[in-house]
Amino acid sequence: MKEFFKDALKLPYKPNNEVREHENQIEDLLKKHGLKYKPQPNGPQQSPDFHVNHNGKVISLECKSSKDPKPIYNGGLPKKGVVYIFSSKKYNETTLYFAEDVVSDKKRELYDEYLMETNQILKKYQALDEWKNDDRGFHFYNRSMYTQKGNAEKTDYFKHENRKRCEQRVLNYKW
C-alpha cells in the first residue's frame, strides 16, 4: 500500500467530471500495484470510491478533485477511517490525508449537536397546523453543507502547515 500511496502523490491533476478521470487514474494505480479492490462499493453517489482488500483489511479510498486548493464536501463531512486522495488543478498536484486529520472529533460533535438542535426546531414548526395544512404541499428540510472558510493557511491543502504530516501518516500507517 505504501508504494501505491507514494505513486498517488506523484499524480497530476485530473478532474472528476462525468468521465471520472481522477478516479480512473487511481483505479489504474490500483491495477498497476496488483491490489484487489471494489469500485463504488456503496453506489456511485456514496463514499467511498474504492474498497481495497489488503492484508486482511478493507481500506476505504475517496477521490477528490478540484480546480481550487481545497476539496468540496457538500453535504458529506469527511468520513472517519477513509483515506482521501485529493487532486488540485491550481497546483497540478495530489495530496493524501485521513479524514480525521482534517476534521477533529470535537468539531464533529459540535456539528452533531447543532444538527440535532436544528432538527428539533424544524419538528416544532412541522407540528403546527399552518405548516401541515399547506394546500400547495410546500415543505422544508435542513440540509448540511460543509464548507471551509478562512485564509489559505487554513484552507489550502497544499500550503497547509500539516500537509506533510498528513501525508506521512497515510504513508507510514501499518497497512
Question: Where on the chain are the PLM-derived regions?
Answer:
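Nucleic-acid endonuclease domains
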Residues: 1-48, 52-56, 65-175
